[in-house]
């Protein structure tokens, strides 16, 4: 596919097979990463989408090394793998774990082969300048079948009779660098997705926003320590853990009418409700006894006497 002929060398056949496979894998890294990123952004909240875009602006040393990152991601994903979860973050994080493991090993192999070729490169050969090597942004726009041809033309324009071993070394260096930049993007995205599983998407979004604000603030106006996601989620966990559950059963409202509490007062030695309106005295009917006066304290004489 790549039309690479290095049969005069004793190790030409082996290098040709490894070189062809590594070029094919490294060229496929970019579209795989871009496709999955765009697909995931379509189903993402606007704030989370912005936070995910801001992940690319964070310093490189903020993220763990690839070996540590993959190990932490697998620990976070293991419970979801056992339950065959199909959550968005689980599927995307699983994709990036497989992608990073495969292409990271491939990239390390490319570096090892490039270093081993140094011994057979003529000592007087000048290295290909960086400007003649295809960059990551250019590789995204060049068709897959033309990537090798474009790089070969640049090497020839630098030096037409450039030694073939030095050419292979230049190709490996160029494609390994493209792979590393693609892996860096995949590493940041993997960190985002498996942390969303650990802490929740809303908490990770809030954390990224606070962290970028802290980083963009001048040193003399900001706190000494950067915000941590543990400190952000601790108040939420404390509030949830501090809730007390009542042991008794509570009657649901609406099943029985609520009884109205009526205040009462004592009027002339008997209880009388305030809610009841005082009735006006009814007119005296014929034949009814006269009402007893409250001012008279003596008894009326008995008619028997």
UniProtKB/Swiss-Prot annotation:
GO MF annotations, alphabetized: structural molecule activity
Record InterPro entries: Hepatitis_core (IPR002006), Viral_capsid_core_dom_sf_HBV (IPR036459)
Entry's family note: Belongs to the avihepadnavirus precore antigen family.
Function: May regulate immune response to the intracellular capsid in acting as a T-cell tolerogen, by having an immunoregulatory effect which prevents destruction of infected cells by cytotoxic T-cells.
Signal peptide: 1-19
A Gene Ontology term for the protein's cellular component: extracellular region
Propeptide: 273-305
Top-level taxon in the UniProt lineage: Viruses
The UniProt record lists the keyword Signal: yes
Compositional bias annotation for Basic residues: 258-277, 295-305
Binding partners and assembly: Homodimerizes.
Compartment list: Secreted
Keywords of this entry: Host-virus interaction, Secreted, Signal, Viral immunoevasion
Protein's name in the database: External core antigen
Pfam families hit by this protein: Hepatitis_core
Site, as annotated: Cleavage: 272-273
Region (Disordered): 226-305
């Amino acid at each position: 596919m790549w039309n690479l002929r290095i049969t005069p060398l004793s190790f030409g056949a082996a290098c040709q097979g490894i070189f062809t496979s590594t070029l094919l894998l490294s060229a496929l890294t970019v579209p795989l990463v871009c496709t999955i990123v765009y697909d995931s952004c379509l189903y993402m909240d606007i704030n989370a989408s912005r936070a995910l875009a801001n992940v690319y602006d964070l310093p490189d040393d903020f993220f763990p090394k690839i070996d540590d990152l993959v190990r932490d991601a697998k620990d976070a994903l293991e419970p979801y793998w056992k339950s065959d979860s199909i959550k968005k973050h689980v599927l995307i994080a699983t994709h990036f774990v497989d992608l990073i493991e495969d292409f990271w090993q491939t990239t390390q192999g490319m570096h090892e082969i490039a270093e081993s070729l140094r011994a057979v490169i003529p000592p007087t050969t000048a290295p290909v300048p960086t400007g003649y090597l295809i960059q990551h942004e250019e590789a995204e726009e060049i068709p897959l079948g033309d990537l090798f041809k474009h790089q070969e033309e640049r090497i020839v324009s630098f030096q037409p009779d450039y030694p073939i071993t030095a050419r292979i070394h230049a190709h490996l260096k160029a494609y390994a660098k493209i792979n590393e930049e693609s892996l860096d993007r995949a590493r940041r995205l993997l960190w985002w997705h498996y942390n969303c599983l650990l802490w929740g998407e809303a908490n990770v979004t809030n954390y990224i926003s606070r962290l970028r604000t802290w980083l963009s603030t001048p040193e003399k106006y900001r706190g000494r320590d950067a915000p941590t996601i543990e400190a952000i989620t601790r108040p939420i966990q404390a509030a949830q853990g501090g809730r007390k559950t009542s042991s008794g059963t509570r009657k649901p409202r609406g099943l029985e009418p609520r009884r109205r509490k009526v205040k009462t007062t004592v009027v002339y030695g008997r209880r009388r409700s305030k809610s009841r309106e005082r009735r006006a005295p009814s007119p005296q009917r014929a034949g009814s006894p006269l009402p007893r006066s409250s001012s008279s304290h003596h008894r009326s004489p008995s008619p028997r006497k």
